[in-house]
């Protein structure tokens, strides 16, 4: 199981424990590119950001918050480890039951990129996440990183939930960088072809 439910302490309250992101694991195709998260991408966010634990990235379903002590977030050698003390509410209890059955067993995170790197590998465009701001960590139904143990984020939800004017501008800049990298590679290939002739 990718995410576990543990009952700890005298009151045996359940905790949601897992990895919201794994380092060096590639996402599914995110619309012309894949992402990979590098070690250190969360270092500053874990120290500074006000992070919520949400269900499916939905701000109507808050499971915990690091500033209130109901969410613990740490970056270790494996990835972004989380521990949530969920509220004793009907919807949270229903979620826990679904997780115990194995219906929901993957995680994700909502973020804004502070530093990234684009490159091509084996004909695929890759985006390395080097430094990010965190909004949320979430148990999710549909993650983007199918091959990872914890799976990182729900593609559809992140794009729908976090399209602010700033995000759109950052995405446009990232797309420009990706296209610039593609043009640069094509120019290098053209230069090599010219030298061969």
Please identify what each model-predicted range represents.
Residues 26-29, 63-64, 145-148:
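Short helix/loop capping segments that flank catalytic or ligand/cofactor-binding pockets
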Residues 1-48, 161, 170, 180, ...:
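Polar/acidic, low-complexity leader/linker segments enriched in S/T/G and N/D
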Residues 49-61, 107:
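Short conserved beta-strand and strand-loop elements enriched in small hydrophobics
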Residues 25-27, 60-62, 116-118:
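Flexible loop/turn segments at secondary-structure boundaries
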Residues 154-197:
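Charged/polar low-complexity intrinsically disordered segments, enriched in acidic residues
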Residues 58-68, 75:
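A surface-exposed loop-and-adjacent beta-strand signature within N-terminal beta-sandwich domains
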Residues 6-9, 15-17, 52, 70-170:
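Residue microenvironments linked to proteolytic maturation
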